[in-house]
């Protein structure tokens, strides 16, 4: 904070639950299992918000390299998911609400909403109205349909044909070391994806 002007908003993104057992996983019970146990996460957020003055925090859970079904609920995963993606969405919401309930004045950003596709704005609105978070963050849906906020503000329903299909190819682009975007909806990223796949095949 000392390095920036007073009108600069300092924010952070924080993983509050790893989704794998103690002692390697954060946000789980020391007694075993992988159910969320967020007492340490609540304390950590308190340090960031109350002690250090952090005003804006984006919450995430899971590890995209180990358990992407926790981190990004999707229909298409690199392995058979052990749960319905809606279970993952519900977990994300519950974890976020635990933090928001502990610090009602903290501006919290909810994540993991893109799985709901054209219904994601309704989930976001309900989450805000019911105190789960104060802002809704969208990653995959914003890649697929960059104009979706305009549609929401105009009171129009989202076109399912423009929404994210949760295929994970935007993540693959990042792992290629490339720029990320929607491979399905944007031909620029379709070509970029194919170029990276072809390049990888040649190296193999």
Feature locations, PLM:
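Flavin-dependent oxidoreductase catalytic cores
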Residues: 1-204
């Amino acid at each position: 904070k000392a390095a920036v002007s007073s009108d600069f908003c300092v924010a952070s993104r924080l993983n509050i639950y790893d989704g794998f057992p103690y002692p390697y996983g954060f946000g789980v019970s020391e007694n075993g299992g992988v159910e969320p146990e967020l007492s340490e996460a609540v304390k950590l957020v308190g340090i960031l918000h109350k002690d250090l003055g952090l005003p804006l925090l984006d919450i995430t859970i899971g590890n995209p390299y180990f358990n992407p079904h926790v981190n990004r609920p999707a229909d298409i995963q690199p392995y058979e998911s052990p749960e319905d993606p809606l279970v993952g969405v519900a977990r994300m919401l519950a974890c976020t609400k635990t933090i928001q309930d502990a610090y009602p004045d903290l501006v919290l950003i909810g994540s993991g909403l893109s799985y709901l596709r054209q219904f994601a704005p309704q989930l976001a609105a309900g989450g805000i109205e019911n105190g789960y978070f104060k802002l809704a963050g969208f990653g995959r849906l914003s890649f697929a349909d960059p104009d979706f906020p305009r549609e929401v503000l105009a009171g129009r329903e989202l076109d399912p044909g423009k929404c994210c299909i949760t295929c994970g190819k935007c993540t693959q682009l990042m792992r290629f070391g490339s720029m990320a975007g929607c491979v399905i909806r944007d031909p620029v990223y379709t070509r970029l994806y194919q170029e990276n796949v072809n390049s990888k095949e040649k190296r193999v």
